Amino acid sequence: MKKNALINAELSYVVATLGHTDEITICDAGLPIPDETQRIDLALIPGVPTFIDTVKAVLGEMQIEGVVMAEEFAQVSPDLHQALIALIRNEELLCGKKITLSYVSHEAFKVHTQDSKAVIRTGECTPYANVIFQSGVVF
């Protein structure tokens, strides 16, 4: 369910049309995006927009109840992983609900993106900077 206003019309529309348990993926510049999945390509140049800035914008709009990440994210890019975890924990405090964290292999993550309503590509060039958000409800 949508919470606020985004400037990007395509992204705003996707968030507004999410139902309970629908998923979207936010990814780095290198994640392969399935042909059959809607691609919202925000990448301009390497590093713009960042993964974290994109996550913040989406969290400002979307109620989440679950998160899926690749196990490799925490191992290979621990600083960015911890920044994401901090945002998720803050979101839990703001919404007063527990958000489930799940980890899968990077290969399984890539397969899981096929279930996303959309994949949002950022300019992030940090390895494994990818997350799947599962939509929750605001009530």
Curated annotation (Swiss-Prot):
EC supergroup of this enzyme: isomerase
Top-level taxon: Bacteria
InterPro entries: D-ribose_pyranase, RbsD-like_sf, RbsD_FucU
Record GO cellular component, one term: cytosol
Cellular compartment(s): Cytoplasm
Annotated metabolic or biological route of this protein: Carbohydrate metabolism; D-ribose degradation; D-ribose 5-phosphate from beta-D-ribopyranose: step 1/2
Function, in words: Catalyzes the interconversion of beta-pyran and beta-furan forms of D-ribose.
Subunit structure: Homodecamer.
Name of the protein this chain belongs to: D-ribose pyranase
Lineage: Bacteria, Pseudomonadati, Pseudomonadota, Gammaproteobacteria, Vibrionales
